[in-house]
Design a protein with these regions (language model features):
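Class I S-adenosyl-L-methionine-dependent methyltransferase catalytic core
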Residues: 1-193
Length: 193
């Protein structure tokens, strides 16, 4: 019972690729918050695990171009079939931001690699469970490379398994973790609706 109360269903099957579709509202809330904080994004946004294209579709509403990487074609027209962890800096233009919902089990690898690819001052936003704050290995990473902002949602965000329709609410809390490469101050909390 305690597992269920903590938002974990021990009977639930995880998607083998950790493919959970981001609710569009989550991306819109992020874009609005970045605007409110005067965090300007460059013209190009990269999604490291594009899936069905929810993140690029949303950022395009704000006038940005987008490219997306994935290990499988899940229907977004601009998908580049390549594991993001193998992308090299010369594969990308000089000025871009990263907005992603990576596989949870590989999230730290995706964040580290993304930060390595970004120029100083570059922005990386990663959609994660709030429990991403926990764990000794992530604590060490956060101590050395703190996010500029942690943006938790006050209303639960629903993530669809494999793009399926979400029928019920979620017991899992999510947040955007936002890095500005080179910034080392303590993170600020920005509440999202």
């Amino acid at each position: 019972m305690s597992l269920v109360m903590n938002g974990i269903n021990p009977d639930a099957k995880r998607h083998p690729d950790d493919f959970y579709v981001t609710e569009p509202r989550a991306v819109i809330e992020l874009m609005e918050a970045l605007g409110d904080l005067n965090i300007g994004l460059p013209p190009l946004v990269v999604d490291s695990s594009v899936g069905s294209g929810v993140i690029p579709d949303a950022v395009q509403l704000y006038g940005h171009d987008a490219i997306g990487y994935d290990v499988e074609d899940r229907g977004w027209a601009g998908t580049r079939l390549q594991d993001f962890l193998t992308v090299k800096a010369p594969d990308l233009p000089q000025n871009f931001a990263i907005i992603q919902n990576p596989p949870f089990r590989l999230a730290l690898d995706f964040i580290r690699h993304g930060l390595d690819l970004l120029p100083d001052g570059g922005v990386l936003c990663s959609f994660e469970r709030i429990s991403f704050l926990e764990g000794a290995c992530r604590r060490d990473f956060f101590d050395r490379t703190p996010p500029a902002y942690v943006m938790p949602f006050t209303r639960r965000v629903k993530c669809a398994v494999d793009g399926s329709a979400v029928k019920a609410g979620s017991a899992i809390c999510f947040a955007w973790f936002v890095w500005i490469k080179g910034r080392a101050e303590r993170p600020q909390i920005v509440w999202l609706d």
